[in-house]
């Protein structure tokens, strides 16, 4: 009888110790998902887009796709707080401040004004930008190869010399080229400066036409059509938002519009040798994956578009009575 009592006490002690160890382990696991790995927690990414138009939307979507392809599925390993500043810098500042308060793990900034807003708000949260033409002049990084700040990303700088060569090839007798832009956008001013440098080399007289907002685009385009043989549209957020208006207004006077990226050609511009913004955003997403895995943005070089291709709108060419040389059509992406 005494022996049975001892066995009972021993069994009870073993059970009690087992329960204590189990409870302790459960408590530790509750504090650190997947056995204590901080990397397993759901990442919070704030996305600020300066305004809504197809090129910027494509860049944003490409970024999200890159993260998904790397295993960061929305709602599982990452959440996105998508915000649009509606082309208002005060709204952009409010959004940037919100991301900082929320202690986001990373911020995507789409276009120069959005990137400047978030960089002004935080020097610690990693920032990845896309669709920024000159991040050095914008004050975001110290250099393209060595950012030196909490910012890196993908630039949409386009080879304007290549665009002007397209005009030469298609319109060999053209002399005057219009340049529609918003002087309030630093990215557009950079492109204008570049165009002024290379236009004379192509034998062109560049005629800049400023616009201050969307409501000015139609009138500005109409004014240009009486002075130029062709119109070039840079990656200007204001003008690109009204590209359909630019194309329609110019078409009335049989003036071709040359674009700086594929989205403009899809909406009626004649041709471009430019950027695929979804691919550019995808590159930015790949940089974000590196940062989420522990890389420091200040050591990740700024990237530019890896592949530039010719895109031509055949319907626009037909409507304008313009023949596209076979040398361009051979490898071009064709939009009917």
Which positions does each model-derived feature cover?
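Short, low-complexity disordered leader/linker segments with a strong preference
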Residues: 1-44, 69, 73
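Extracytoplasmic "Venus flytrap"
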Residues: 42-70, 81-90, 184-188, 238-241, ...
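An alpha-beta-alpha
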Residues: 45, 63, 152-199, 301-316
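Structural motif
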Residues: 79-101, 210-224
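Beta-alpha junction/loop-to-helix N-cap segments that form part of ligand/metal-binding clefts
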Residues: 85-142, 233-251, 255, 260
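Hydrophobic alpha-helical segments within soluble ligand-binding/sensing domains
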Residues: 135-174, 276-295
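Pocket-lining segment of extracytoplasmic ligand-binding domains
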Residues: 180, 186-255, 259-261
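Hinge/cleft segment of the Venus flytrap/periplasmic-binding protein
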Residues: 293-336
